């Protein structure tokens, strides 16, 4: 393999940790719905490095109801920051736990990836950020790179980063618009 187009999971986690630290986070929970999955483990490890403060890993199953209950059970533990590793699965479940406990806005929530409901939550200011791999670029750039390689023999070396990008309350509406048109 000459090049990788995408995001590297550890570095994306570092970026998420730095953003949460900058937002004032002191004690964080990284919700891992598939402990042992190297990519997800690296996301939490990167988050821990970027956050720099206290980070606990909450291992769960991939059952959204169980995730919601597990997060709810941890809310009394002084956590002011939660990062989940998948928007549609653990992100939505964590948001439901925060909503049920009346802690939206009091506990900062961020997640990897995007889902329609989490994009709406970001637009409403309920989520600090969604870490965006920019999947459109992950599909488009390899084709463009391969075409250049076939025509001219040129190929980038190493990783061509498409992420981490961050969808925040400030840009979520734009992302929703472009997603509806198939570009995000």
Locations of regions flagged by a protein language model:
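Short, solvent-exposed amphipathic alpha-helices that sit
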Residues: 12-16, 35-54, 93, 97, ...
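Short beta-strand->loop
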Residues: 5-7, 29-38, 59-61, 84-85
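Hydrophobic alpha-helical
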Residues: 47, 61-121
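Loop/turn elements at helix/coil->beta-strand transitions in domains of secreted/extracellular proteins
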Residues: 23-27, 52-55, 77-81, 104-108, ...
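Hinge/cleft segment of the Venus flytrap/periplasmic-binding protein
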Residues: 51, 137-184
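Hydrophobic alpha-helical segments within soluble ligand-binding/sensing domains
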Residues: 4-28, 64-68, 114-118, 133-151
